[in-house]
Amino acid sequence: MAAPSPAGGAPSHAQSSLPSLPAHLQSDTHLTAHLASRFHVGLPTARLSSQALISLNTYTTSTKGPDGGKEGSAMGEAEDLAKRAFTRLGARGENQAVVFLGESGSGKTTIRSHLLSAFLSFSSTPLSSKLSYAAFLFDTLTTTKSLTTQTASKAGLFLELQYDGSSSVNPTLIGGKIIDHRLERSRITSVPTGERSFHVLYYLLAGTSPAEKAHLGFDKAVHVSTSSGAIGHKRWRYLGHPTQLKVGVNDVEGFQHFKTALRKLEFPRSEIAEICQILATILHIGQLEFASGQATTTHAEESGGYSHEGGETVTIVKNKDVLSIIAAFLGLSVEDLENSFGYRTKTIHRERVTVMLDPKGARQNADELARTIYSLLVAYVIEAVNQRICAAEDSVANTISIVDFPGFAQACATGSTLDQLFNNAATELLYNFCLQSFFDRKADELEREEVSVPATSYFDNTDAVRGLLKHGNGLLSILDDQTRRGRTDNQLLESLRRRFENKNPTIIVEGSKRTSLISQNARSAFTVKHFAGEIDYSVNGLIEENGEFISGDLMRLMKSTKSDFVRELFGQAALQTVTHPKEKTAIMQAQVSSKPLRMPSMARRKTSPSSRLAFDAGDADEVESQAESIAKDSSSGRRKSAMLTSGIQGAAGQFLSSLDIVNKCLSSTNLNPYFIFCLKPNDRRIANQFDSKCVRAQVQMFGIAEISQRLRNADFSVFLPFAEFLGLAEIGNIVVGSDKEKAEVVLDEKRWPGNEARVGSTGVFLSERCWADLAKVGERVVPVYAADMSDEGGDGLLHPRSTGYGDSKVRLLNPADQSPGAFIYGDEAKQGYFGSRDLDGRSDAGNSAFNSGDMFRNHETREQMLEKGNEKKMEEVDDAPISGSRKRWIALVYLLTFYIPDFAIKLFGRIKRKDVRMAWREKFAINLIIWFSCGVAIFFIVAFPGLVCPTQHVYSAAELSSHNGKDGHSSFIAIRGVVFDLDKFMPGHYPHIVPESALKKYAGVDATGLFPVQVSALCQGKSGSVDPMVLLDYRPTNISGSATTISGTDTNSVYHDFRHFTNDSRPDWFYEQMVMLKANYLKGYVGYTPKYLNTLGKKSQSIGSINGKVYDLTSYIAGGRLTKAPPGETVPSDVDTDFMDNSVVSLFQSLPGQDLSKHWENLKIDPALRRRMQLCLDNLFFVGHVDTRNSAQCEFARYFILAISVLICSIIVFKFLAALQFGRKNVPENLDKFIICQVPAYTEDEESLRRAIDSMARMRYDDKRKLLVVICDGMIIGQGNDRPTPRIVLDILGVPESVDPEPLSFESLGEGQKQHNMGKVYSGLYEVQGHIVPFLVIVKVGKPSEVSRPGNRGKRDSQMVLMRFLNRVHYNLPMSPMELEMHHQIRNVIGVNPTFYEFILQVDADTVVAPDSATRMVAAFLNDTRLIGVCGETALTNAKNSAVTMIQVYEYYISHNLTKAFESLFGSVTCLPGCFTMYRIRSAETAKPLFVSKEVVDAYAEIRVDTLHMKNLLHLGEDRYLTTLLLKHHSKYKTKYISSAKAWTIAPESWTVFLSQRRRWINSTVHNLIELIPMQQLCGFCCFSMRFVVFVDLLSTVIQPVTLAYIIYLIYWLVKDTSTIPYTSLILLAAIYGLQALIFIIRRKWEMVGWMIVYLLALPVFSLALPLYSFWHMDDFTWGNTRIITGEKGRKVVISDEGKFDPASIPKKKWEEYQTELWEAQTSRDDRSEVSGISYGTKSYHPAQSEYGFPGSRPMSQLDLPRFGSRMSLAPSEMMSRHADMEMENLSHLPSDDAILAEIREILRTADLMSVTKKSIKLELERRFGVNLDLKRPYINSATEAVLAGAL
C-alpha cells in the first residue's frame, strides 16, 4: 500500500511497503539496501502494496519478529495476508489465489505452511485437521533435502480450499483438494550428491520397529565398522550417501507422523501396511545386483535349443534373497520377476521387439520399475486423500488456491533434462502471470474505463512463455509431437531449429541446417533465455525421457500380481495404457500421467459475460473439456485405455495441458491473486547473513523495482461499479449529480492518493486498502480458533504448521521434547503441520500397538505372500491318458525310490509341484540304474576275475630262484614252505656283526636246513606228548634241482639250534621266530602245481595236499626220526620215535602226489587225535601251497576279460575301417534337383548370420534350384545387437524397411494359447558374388497380445513351420493363412511349385558350409534311393579361442570320423546334427512324403512335454529325436554320414555353456537310444546290426565314467606292482588310440596329433565329470505351468495357465480354394472380399514372367515382393493393412477412402500419364480437400497403382 511515509522520527527500515519509499530509492540497489536494513533488525519481510509479500529466509526462525512476537516475522506477514484474502473471499465472493515465486532454498515451503495454517485457523470444522494432514502427506511424499534447503519441494502444488457461499462474513470451509503437478520421478533412482531422496523413504527406514524391519527385510542390513569405530550404515542405492541418513532430520518421528496422518485421513491399517511394503519394495529394488550368466536351463516355452545349446547370454539377479522380498511384496512369482528385468519390449518401426538386456540395461529396467511404483503410489495416496477431503463440485461457491511450484533450476541435479525443462517452464509461466497481473491486465481495464496512468517499462517474458508453452508449435508441443512420431533426438533438434530460428529470440538452437555429425555430438542442445537466466538443455535422450513409456512387459507382469493393493495401484486412472489396435486386451505400453487426476473446482465453470477480464469463450470451452475428460478418468477409477493410433500424449503434452489449466484458472475474472516472493539472503545457507549481491540478483530477476514503480503509478486491486461504490460509501441523496460526480465527491472526501483510487467511466478503481477502508472490513471479526481445540472425535487438532525455520515452543506439551514436524523442516525445535497434542497426547484404542509395535502383526507373512505370488492361475485344457509302458515305468521308479518319502523331496529339495517331484524320482531311479550298470561293469573288470580265480601269493621253485638279489631282482628266502622278504629283513638282522653279504647268499634258496626244530615243542604226537630227545632230520629233496637247498650241516645252522640236547635249550624259539617273520616279512608260500605234485609222487616221494596245503612226509617215513640226549644223559630205551599216527602215514604212502583232502576227512580217528595230527603236519611237514594259477577257472576269468577286450577292439577296428572307406572323394556332376536351404535364426549377431547365409548362397549348386529359407524366431534384439534379428536378416538380404507385409496366423508349438502365432512372409532375390538366389524369410512376430519375446517359440517350432507347410502341400491339406502366403510366394512369385522340392538342407545360423556340400549330399541321395538323411563332417571355426574349445577339436573329429562313420556302415546314424544335415522330403519313385510324412510331423509336433523322458527328447535333443523318428517310422530307409561334405561351426567357449551343451547331448542320447532299442526289424546277421550299434552306444554312454576308472586302475596296477604287467590292457589302449592316430596320419591331418594330446589330458572331463553332471541334472528344466493332475474319478487332466487353445481361431483352407478366390479377386476390380476375409494387394500379375516369376526387366535384387498378391487376414482389412499403424492422430478430419479414390480416378482421367507422379497426385488431392494428407499417403500410393493397373 502507498501509505504515508513513516513519521519523521521513525527509522527508514520501519517502512514495510516498498512502493511507499521515495522515488529516488526505487532502484534495484536501493530496494536491496532497504531490504537489508529491515533484515538486520529482524524484519525479514516487505510488501508490494497489498498484492505481494517479499520474504527473506533467515535460516533461523520464521515465527519471531524483532520484539520476540510474531509481529514483523514471516509467519506474521503470512497470517496477515491470509486474513486479508479470507476477508475479500467473504466480502466480495471472489476466488483467492496465492502464488509463490522463489528459488530453491528461499523458504517457499515454510511460508506456504504458515499460510495454510492461517487459512485453516479461520475454520472450526474437523476438516481443517484433515487438510493439515493432507498437506503434510503431500510434503512427505514430494519434498526432499537439497543442497539449499531441508525442505525442497519436487512437485508442483495447486492446493485448493473450498468454501460455500452461505455466509458473506465467515465463509464455511467445506473441502479441499490437492492437485499435484509433475513429481520429479528421476530422483527416486538418481539421488544427487549431498542431497536426499524423498523424505518418506528415510522415515520408513528409521521409524519402523525391529519386528517391522524384519518383515520389510531391513533387518538384513550389514553394518560395517568404520575406521573411527563408529557403526556405519548399509548403503542403500536409492537413498544416496549413507551420511544422508543423519542430516538433522528426525526421521523416526517423521514416520510416526506419517502413519498418524494416514490413519487420521481414514486409511485402513491394512492399507497403511501395504503402503509401507511398497515403499520398502522400492528400496529393495535399488539393492538388486545384476550379472551376466548363461541360460543353461531349458525354458518351458522353448521347443528346443539352438546351436548355442542353451548358452544364450542372459542377465541374472545375484542377490536372490532381495529379489524374493520384492516378489513377495508385489505378489509376483520370483522367476517371472527376475526374467522381466532381463528384457524389455519396445516398439521399433511399428514392430514390437524384445531387447535382451545386459546388466546395465537390467539396472535401468529395475530403476524404471521403482520410478513407476513410486509415482503410482504418490498418485494413489493423493487421490485417496482427495476422495476424503474434497467437497462436491456443485456445493463449492469459492476457493482459495495456494500455488507453489519447485523453484527455478539452474542445473538438473538428478540428470533429468525433462524435469529441469518442466520446472523452469512452470516457473516461467507463473512469473508471466505475475507480470500480467501487475501490468497488462490492469492496463487493459484502465484503458476500457478511460483512466490514464503513466506507463511503466518492465521485462516482459511473453516470448519465452509462448516459445515454450504455445499449443501446436511451442517447444513442449514440438517435443511431444516428435515423441509421438518416433523421431530421434537430432531430428527433434532440427525441428526446433526450423521452428525458432529468426522467429523467437528466447529459444536458440545452434548450428546450421546441415550440421555435421561431429558438431551434433559436440553440442546436441538448445538454449532458452528464461527470465532467471539462460539455460542450456541437452536433447540427448530427451525424446525417450518424454515418452516415459512403461513397457508392456511390466504391465503384463503386474497383471499377474496376487496382491490386491498392487493391482489397485496399477489399475488407477493415473496409469494410461496403450492397447493393440487389433487386440484390445493386449497392453502394448503404459504411461504414468504427468498431469493431475483432478482439476481446480472453478476450472469447469464458464465465467459470466459480465465478469471483468473475461477470457474468450473458446478458452473456457477448452478448459471445460479438459476438466471433463480428467474428471471422467478419476471418477471411473479405471485406466484410460488408448489405442495405439489414438494420440496418447507424452509427458510434455500432458504437463503443458495441466499448466494451461492452471494459467486459465489463475487468469479467470473472478479471481484475486496474491504473490509471495521468497528470496535467499545468501547462497551458503548461513543464518542472519545478508549478501547484497545475491539478493540484488533476485530483486532484478523478479523485476521487483518495476513492480514497485508500477504500484506507485497504479495500485488498483478492486473495481467497483458506481452503484456498488456509492452503496458502500453510504452518501445517500446528500450529493446531487451523476453517479460519476458522486463518486468523485467521495474520493475527494477520503483524500486517497491518486495511485490508489480513480474514477472510471462506469465505476471506481480502488486499492485493497482503500476498499477495506470503504467497506469497513476492519469492523468484521475473522475468528481464529485455538490450536488445542478438539474435533468431534476428541483428538487434539493437528494444527497446520505454525513455525517454519524458528524455535517457537508454542503448543508443545513438553518444551524439552523434539517438536513434532521438525523432522521435515531441518532446524532445531521446529513444529510442522502437527501440533504435539495429537501425536501422543492421547492414544486411540489400539493405536499404541500400531505406532510402536508391529503394523504387520495381523498381516500375511512375507513367506505367505511369496508362496501366493508363485502360484499360477490354472485351467483345465485337455485329458491326459497314461500309457501302459508309462505306468510300468512309474511302478519301477517307485520300487527304486520308495524309501524316499514325498515330504522329504518337498522339504529338502524345495520342490512343491507333484509332477516335478515325480521327475526327480525318475531322475534318481535312472541314476540308480546307471550307477548299478557302472557297478556291474566295475565288478566284471575288477572283482569278477578275483572271485572266479582268487589271487594266490605263491612262488614256484623257478620263481623263488629268480628272486636271488641279482640283476636288480629282489631277495626272497623260503623256510619250511613259507617265503619271506630277505631284503626287508637284512637291515634289522641281529647280531649286526654279520655282514649283509653273508646273508645275501641265502637269497632265492630254501633255507629250511638252517633252522633245526624241537619236535616236542611243535607236535604233541599220538598220545599228547613227544619225548624231547626225539629229533626229525628234515631234507627238502622234493625241490632239489629247482632251488638251492641248504643242508642241516651248514655252518650257520648251529646259531639257530636250540634243541633239547644242546647246552642252550629253547624249545619254543623256532615257533616264536616264525610268528615274528610271518608278521613282518611274509611274501607268500612255495607253490606246487597239481601236475608237479603228481610227478613227485611218481618219484616215490611221500607228498600230498590237504585243503590246498602241501605236506611232505618222505624223510619221516625214510627213517629220519632220531634220538639224542643232552651231554651227560643217555636216551631211554622206551622212547617212541613214531609220533605220527600210522593211518595218517599210510595215507601219504598209499596216495603220494595227490589231493588227500577227502581221504583226510574220512579217516576213522577221534577228533582230538585229528587236531594233534593236523598240528604236527602244519608245524613239521608243511612245504607250501597248491598252485592253482593255471587252473581252468583262472583261465576262464583271464579269457573272459580278454574276450570283452577283443570285442571292444573289434568295434574299434570296424570304426577304423569305416573311417578308411570314406577316404575317396568324388566330384559329382551338376545336379538338377530342387533343394530348400533352411536357416533358423534367434539372437545371433550379424556376422554369424551373414556368414551362414552367404555360404549357402555361394554353394556350387544351380541357384535356380535352391531356395534359401530363413526363419526368424521372434522379434528379439540379442545382447550386443543394435537391431532385432529379423531386421538384421532382412538388411543382409536387401529388403527395405518400407516393405511391411501383414502378419498372418499359423500354428506354433506352445502351451495353451501360445499355439496361436503370427508371422510375416518376405520373399525376393539375394545377390552375392555372382549368385542370385531366391529367398523366403518367415518372421514369427506373435499375436498382438504377446508382450515379451513376441513370436518366440524355439528351434523345433522353426523347423515345424517348414515341415508342417510341406506336409500340407504334399497331402493337399487345408493351410493356415501364413502357409497359404508361403505357398503363394513360392509358387507365384518365386515360380516353383513347392512339391518340386525333394531335399531340405538344415543349417544353423552360426554354421558355414563348404561350397560343394549340397552337391555331395544330393549325389549321395541319388546314389542310394533308400537314403532318408545325410550329415557331413562338422569342424570348429573357433578351435583356439579358449581351453574349452581346444579340448573339443579332437572330440569333434573322432565323433564324426569314427562313431558316425561306424554307424553309417549299418545305415543307422542315430544322430543327424541339426547344424548340418540334409533330409529327403519325398521318395524319388512314388513321391511319398518321408521327412514330412504325417507320422513324423505329428510326433515331432508334440506339444504336451510334461514327463522327464519327453523333456529330454524334445527340449534337449530335438535333432537327435528327429533322427529317431525317421528311423522309427521309415525303418527301411537309411541315415548316413559322408565325410566329403564339410561345414564349420562355433563351439561353446565358456565352461558353463559347454557343460550345458554336453548335458543336453548326453541326456538326449540316453533317452533317444532307449526309444530305439525296442524297435522291431533292427536285427541283422548275428545281431551285428543297428540294434547292436544302438546297444553299444547306449552302454558306452552309460558306463563312460567306468572307462576312466579302468584306465586309472591300470595305472595304479602298474605303479603298485611292476612285476606283473597287464599287457592285454595296454595293447587294447594302444589299439584304441593307435588306430585313431592312424586315421588322421593316413589323411595327413598332422595337427590332430596335438589336439589328441589335449583331448587325452581332458579325458577326466569327457569321461567322468560330464556324464556324472549330466545324469544328475537330467531334470534341470524350467518346467512351465502346464501339468497333469488327477481330476474327478481318477481322470488325468492337463491344466495350464496359458489358457485353452481353440484351433478354430486359425482359419484354414486348401490351396485350390485360395487360388480360386485370389483369381476372382484379381479380376473383379474389387479390393475387398467380404466373405472370405481376404484382403488383396494392389499389384496385378506382370505378363512377362521370368523363370523366378518376376518381371524380366525389373532388377531382381531390389524386388518389393511382399506388396504383391494377397494377404490373409482374420477379418476384412483396408488395403495395404497399414492404416492400423498410422501416426497416432485423430483421422476424423480427413476425407474418406472412397472420396479419395473418386478424386484419384478423376485426376488420372484427365492427367498426362507420361508425366504424372504419385507426389503430384497427392498435392492435387490436398489442394482439392484443403487438408494435409500425409497420413493418407500409403493409401493414395496404393490406390493410384491399383487404378493404373486396372485392379480398381
UniProtKB/Swiss-Prot annotation:
Residues carrying covalently attached carbohydrate according to the record: 1038, 1063, 1423, 1457, 1563, 1786
Amino-acid positions noted as binding ATP in the UniProt annotation, renumbered to this chain: 102-109
SUPFAM superfamilies: Cytochrome b5-like heme/steroid binding domain, DEK C-terminal domain, Nucleotide-diphospho-sugar transferases, P-loop containing nucleoside triphosphate hydrolases
Actin-binding as annotated region, ranges: 659-683
One GO molecular-function entry: actin binding
Group of enzyme by EC: transferase
Entry-linked CDD domains: MYSc_Myo17
Gene Ontology CC annotations of this record: cell periphery; cell septum; cell tip; myosin complex; plasma membrane
Induction notes from the record: Expressed during hyphal growth.
Function of the protein: Polymerizes chitin, a structural polymer of the cell wall and septum, by transferring the sugar moiety of UDP-GlcNAc to the non-reducing end of the growing chitin polymer. Important for hyphal growth and conidiophore development but not pathogenicity.
UniProt comment concerning the protein's domains: The N-terminal myosin motor-like domain (MMD) does not seem to have motor activity but is indispensable for polarized cell wall synthesis via binding to actin that ensures the proper localization to the hyphal tips and septation sites near actin structures.
Family statement drawn from the similarity comment of this UniProt entry: In the N-terminal section; belongs to the TRAFAC class myosin-kinesin ATPase superfamily. Myosin family. In the C-terminal section; belongs to the chitin synthase family. Class V subfamily.
Protein name per its UniProtKB record: Chitin synthase E
